[in-house]
Amino acid sequence: MIFDKSLLGFIGICCLPPILLLIYLPNVSLQWIIVQSGFFSFGAGLLTYKLIPSVADLTSQANLTGMDLNKKGDPKFSGKKIPESLGICVAVVYLVCVILFQTFQWFSFPETIQLSEYNAALTSICFMILLGFGDDVLNLRWRYKLILPMFASLPLLVAYAGGTTVVVPDINFPVPLREWLGVVFDLGIFYRIYLLMLAIFCTNSINILAGINGLEVGQSVVIATSIIIHNLIELTIASSVPSSSSFSSSALSSVSPHLFSLILMIPFLFTTISLLFYNWYPSRVFVGDTYTYFSGMCFAVVAILCHFSKTLLLFFIPQILNFLYSVPQLFGIIPCPRHRVPKFNPETGKMEAIPTNLTIINLLLMITGPLTERQLCVYLLIFQGLCSCVGFGIRYHHLHHNPTLIFI
């Protein structure tokens, strides 16, 4: 296989910062656990890469195939059927990897394992994999896609052991919020409702921002990388505390959530990168709703159980903007076609915007003019990465003034 240079560059840029942060992590014990998780994840990535062609043959035999709408009229690709629902391969390998490492962790580092969180995470992820594959096969209606994730999220709310308070912004316009509510305000049951809505948003937002070869998987790689970087930064700060040099109870309380998040996100990143090799332009497989729901729930799981749900939203800035821009169509205010992708011009070989399809994909084309599908995907992923940088700036801009804000 000949790898695209832009793809290799993208993967290299995503992988380099976490590797550097891991090298400089002060706590050797944590470092060793993460490295071991990396070995398991690397094996899962290789297995995914090897299995995808075989699973693609199986989905083709089951008539789970589709046409690439962005290549109509292109003599190289026109009429070619592409295997769909390859997210099922990634999801199954991911689950096997996490379960195997959970077993390994139980025997090697029993003091670091979080069984209730593991079980809740795997239950919710499995539910969404089932829903996604069911959608690929049965073509479920949107109302089911909004309702069923609520039930998938219930194990997360049961296992959630974090607080329900928020820091009130120091804003005096239009009203002095802190004078009315105080510095910290307890939302109670409304915070859990917010977590429920977060899970529904995550599972659907990646599915909404889709339709370009490599986009669904590429944005998941960027978000997963951002989460891993965030976790490593938090572990580095927590490890600078003298008591965190070993696995004391006080040290574990600060590092366990982020260690748990890394154990879930590292195999996700490796298996997703393997899928990206096949889904990059020109795509040889389609990921299906199985992958988009699986990836969205993975992000929701770590954000909720590891207590950084507000930080996760900073990494979802493009998805939030796309949702807000799409609201008139999503809620039926104006007609919403089944596929809101741009149109392909076979004469120029470029994608052109359809202004009535309200997505940031079409909005970008309206700003830049026609682009090739590869260029369009690269620009959108660059935007995703820049938004993550903005998110890190917002998240950590107070760190040099007050290091305790890092744990909010």
From Swiss-Prot:
Belongs to the glycosyltransferase 4 family. It comes from the Eukaryota. UDP-N-acetylglucosamine--dolichyl-phosphate N-acetylglucosaminephosphotransferase that operates in the biosynthetic pathway of dolichol-linked oligosaccharides, the glycan precursors employed in protein asparagine (N)-glycosylation. The assembly of dolichol-linked oligosaccharides begins on the cytosolic side of the endoplasmic reticulum membrane and finishes in its lumen. The sequential addition of sugars to dolichol pyrophosphate produces dolichol-linked oligosaccharides containing fourteen sugars, including two GlcNAcs, nine mannoses and three glucoses. Mg(2+) binds at N207, D289. This is UDP-N-acetylglucosamine--dolichyl-phosphate N-acetylglucosaminephosphotransferase. Its cofactor is Mg(2+). GO terms for biological process: dolichol-linked oligosaccharide biosynthetic process. Homodimer. Pathway: Protein modification; protein glycosylation. GO terms for cellular component: endoplasmic reticulum membrane; membrane. Dolichyl phosphate binds at K145, I200, F201, C202, T203, N204, S205, I206, N207, I208. Coiled coil: none annotated. Keywords: Endoplasmic reticulum, Glycosyltransferase, Magnesium, Membrane, Metal-binding, Transferase, Transmembrane, Transmembrane helix. Its main location: endoplasmic reticulum. It is a multi-pass membrane protein. GO terms for molecular function: glycosyltransferase activity; metal ion binding; UDP-N-acetylglucosamine-dolichyl-phosphate N-acetylglucosaminephosphotransferase activity. It is found in: Endoplasmic reticulum membrane. The chain crosses the membrane at residues 6-26, 32-52, 87-107, 120-140, 147-167, 181-201, 221-241, 258-278, 297-317, 351-371, 376-396. Its EC number is 2.7.8.15. It catalyses: a di-trans,poly-cis-dolichyl phosphate + UDP-N-acetyl-alpha-D-glucosamine = an N-acetyl-alpha-D-glucosaminyl-diphospho-di-trans,poly-cis-dolichol + UMP. UDP-N-acetyl-alpha-D-glucosamine binds at D68, E84, N213, R338, H339, R340. Inhibited by natural nucleoside antibiotic tunicamycin, which acts as a structural analog and competitor of UDP-GlcNAc. It is an enzyme of class 2 (transferase). InterPro entries: Glycosyl_transferase_4, GPT.
